[in-house]
């Protein structure tokens, strides 16, 4: 009798914690069949098998298409926000860059952030109080809706809600050794079925010790340019105002956004050498200003307990002023090149989606239409104009379900893309099939295979026929003959979560034929850069991730390593690259104190004849939480003379070009952070907005 009561109690607690979550539901267009539920109710590894409920001593739960990570109360007590919480929880294959306020996958792919299934930003994560975070969902195998994007993973934070009262918070992160500031402020009010919110965030940089080193070699010249320390800075601002209304089976959401960007202090001075002899100097000064208002409308009508109809519309206007000035003196001969461009881009995205779910089967379908109109007016040394119109109609459908412990998903997307600029135009239909099968013989072990075909569409800048002189030795130009091509992707995955360990292994293969990529050639003694057509490409990536709880819920260590291989072929030429990336962190938290030591060596990436170099980072930081305030102190990139922020390399027979941008201010940077938050009100679980679109293309050909 006593044992029966204990089992009943555990079952009741588990179902209560998940508040009716044992059902079919959707996230975006990814249908999820709720399967075995695990909850960290004790530190033991004892398992109670209660129908389809499993209670186990781990806060990492493996689902059919995602991981669920449950933050412990100790993690929440030691964190200042949901963003801070991300660095204390084990996200397999995710690099959390605390300094630059960003997160990517091991191989550098983009991650989409969400809060309660609504598209969000890192600034939004800073507005979430840790105690309001119920769970963190991590998706690294996405469905048909995202098969036309460059998103490879999703981090969704599920939070508590408030029906009355409100929330207010401030966040400030400043460097003590240089001028680097990050500011954030927000306020939220709830009244009956309505929620009002207003937020502001900005990022300001004003460095004095940055420089760029370049080297150029072709058939006629061998020029190296040694960077002279120059100022580097920018100022980004973002304002959001939102209103949400929910009653019964209807939800309405409207969001206004206004963002500005000022890059007016990014000068580059260089000394020019012909082989080893100093022959002159150069000065480059790009300036960029932009502002963008946007509006996002969303509504959802729940037809029945099994069906929903959703609608989303996003409108955006982007205006940009860009000026590029270059001057050099070589052997007492002066030359100067300058151009300006005033750009305006108007875009509209509309989407409608229908969802339907049964006991062991889910199905959804949607239609999304994008339209954009871009105008670029050039001045000074470039007299061409660039006016384009592009359209994209994407229809998708997907089903998913399970048979016992085998989970399956299949879907297809069909694209119609249209582009017109002057006399150049194309219309093309693209197909985006995908499928996935996952086998879970144990609740803590899974293996899966996923296939997808993702077409790549050329950007506006690569299609532009405008030629721009970079200096007397180099130029770059667009290629109006480029056309979309198909990427074939395969992914094999294994994951195992025994007691204190978590282990994952992924093998990715990507291939394409008749594609376009970066190229270099020589014309009249000058090196030219242009996207050109290649015959084929092959990409192989193997990444391994592991984490271990040294002291459970207090001290853990994780690490990753990735092998990356690229090969591109054009006629009888082959370009290849093999590279490794690795990193890890040690995290300690106890009561209101936490400490974090991390390092990340970013990978190189080959795209045709051009290799890209990312920024490798390291940090040591700690924080202490006192009532509603949190104080943090950190050292970023310790024991370094400089930080290589970015770089690239072109290589071809007889042609070579390298460029490395380095910032001394980012080395040994000491930062101080202060945050304050307060909230009041009662909690409730609101309906989730599940459709989100945005136009992140600037459309300005620089």
Predicted regions span which residues?
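Outer-membrane beta-barrel translocator/receptor signature
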Residues: 148-155, 163-211, 234-237, 249
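N-terminal periplasmic accessory domains that precede
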Residues: 40-42, 52-54, 82-85, 102, ...
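Short acidic/polar hinge/loop motifs at secondary-structure boundaries
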Residues: 118-143, 185
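Face-selective signature of the C-terminal outer-membrane beta-barrel domain
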Residues: 236-263, 285-424, 428-434, 438-448, ...
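Surface-exposed extracellular loop regions of Gram-negative outer-membrane beta-barrel proteins
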Residues: 418, 443-490, 507-526, 639-655
């Amino acid at each position: 009798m006593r044992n029966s009561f204990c089992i009943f109690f555990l079952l009741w607690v588990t179902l209560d914690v998940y508040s009716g979550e044992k059902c079919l539901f959707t996230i975006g267009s990814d249908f999820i069949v709720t399967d075995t539920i695990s909850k960290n109710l004790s530190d033991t590894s004892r398992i109670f098998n209660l129908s389809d409920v499993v209670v186990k001593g781990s806060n990492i739960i493996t689902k059919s298409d995602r991981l669920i990570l449950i933050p412990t109360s100790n993690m929440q007590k030691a964190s200042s926000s949901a963003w801070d919480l991300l660095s204390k929880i084990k996200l397999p294959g995710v690099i959390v860059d605390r300094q630059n306020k960003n997160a990517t996958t091991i191989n550098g792919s983009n991650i989409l952030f969400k809060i309660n299934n609504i598209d969000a930003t890192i600034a939004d994560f800073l507005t979430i109080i840790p105690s309001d975070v119920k769970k963190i969902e991590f998706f690294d195998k996405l469905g048909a809706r995202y098969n036309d994007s460059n998103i490879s993973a999703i981090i969704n934070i599920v939070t508590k809600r408030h029906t009355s009262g409100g929330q207010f918070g401030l966040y400030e992160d400043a460097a003590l050794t240089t001028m680097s500031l990050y500011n954030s402020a927000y306020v939220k009010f709830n009244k009956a079925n309505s929620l009002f919110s207003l937020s502001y965030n900005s990022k300001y940089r004003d460095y004095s010790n940055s420089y760029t080193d370049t080297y150029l070699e072709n058939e006629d010249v061998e020029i190296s340019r040694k960077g002279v320390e120059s100022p580097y800075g920018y100022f980004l601002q973002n304002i959001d105002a939102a209103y949400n209304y929910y009653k019964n089976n209807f939800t309405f959401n409207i969001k206004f956004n206004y963002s500005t960007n000022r890059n007016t202090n990014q000068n580059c001075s260089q000394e020019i050498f012909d082989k080893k002899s100093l022959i002159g100097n150069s000065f480059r000064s790009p300036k960029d200003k932009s502002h963008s208002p946007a509006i996002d409308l969303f509504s959802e009508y729940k037809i029945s307990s099994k069906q929903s109809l959703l609608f989303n519309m996003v409108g955006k206007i982007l205006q940009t002023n860009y000026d590029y000035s270059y001057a050099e003196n070589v052997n007492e001969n002066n030359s100067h090149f300058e151009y300006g461009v005033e750009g305006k881009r108007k875009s509209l995205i509309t989407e409608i989606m229908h969802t339907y779910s049964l006991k062991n089967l889910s199905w959804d379908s949607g239609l999304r239409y994008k339209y954009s109109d871009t105008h670029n007016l050039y001045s000074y040394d470039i007299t061409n104009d660039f006016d384009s119109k592009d359209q994209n109609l994407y229809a998708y459908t997907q089903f998913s379900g399970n048979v016992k412990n085998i989970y399956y998903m299949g879907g297809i997307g069909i694209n119609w893309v249209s582009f017109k600029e002057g006399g150049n135009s194309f219309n093309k239909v693209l197909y985006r099939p995908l499928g996935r099968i996952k086998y879970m013989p144990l609740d803590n072990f899974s293996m899966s295979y996923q296939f997808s075909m993702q077409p790549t569409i050329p950007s506006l800048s690569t299609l532009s026929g405008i030629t721009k002189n970079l200096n007397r030795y180099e130029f770059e130009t667009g290629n109006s003959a480029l056309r979309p091509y198909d990427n074939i992707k395969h992914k094999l995955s294994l994951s195992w979560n025994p007691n204190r360990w978590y282990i994952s292994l992924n093998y990715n293969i990507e291939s394409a034929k008749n594609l376009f990529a970066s190229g270099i050639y020589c014309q009249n003694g000058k090196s030219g850069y242009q996207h050109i057509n290649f015959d084929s490409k092959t990409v192989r990536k193997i990444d391994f991730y592991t984490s271990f709880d040294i002291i459970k819920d207090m001290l853990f260590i994780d690490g990753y390593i990735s092998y990356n291989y690229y090969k591109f072929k054009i006629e009888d030429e082959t370009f290849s690259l093999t590279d490794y990336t690795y990193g890890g962190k040690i995290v300690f938290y106890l009561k209101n104190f936490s400490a974090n030591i991390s390092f990340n060596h970013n990978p190189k990436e080959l795209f045709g004849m051009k290799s890209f170099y990312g920024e490798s980072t390291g940090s040591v930081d700690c924080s202490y939480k006192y009532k509603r305030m949190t104080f943090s102190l950190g050292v970023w990139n310790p024991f370094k003379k400089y930080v290589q922020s970015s770089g690239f390399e072109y290589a071809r027979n007889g042609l070579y070009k390298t460029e490395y941008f380095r910032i001394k201010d980012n080395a040994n940077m000491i930062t101080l952070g202060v945050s304050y938050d307060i909230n009041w009100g009662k909690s409730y679980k609101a309906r989730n907005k599940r459709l989100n679109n945005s136009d992140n293309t600037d459309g300005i050909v620089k």
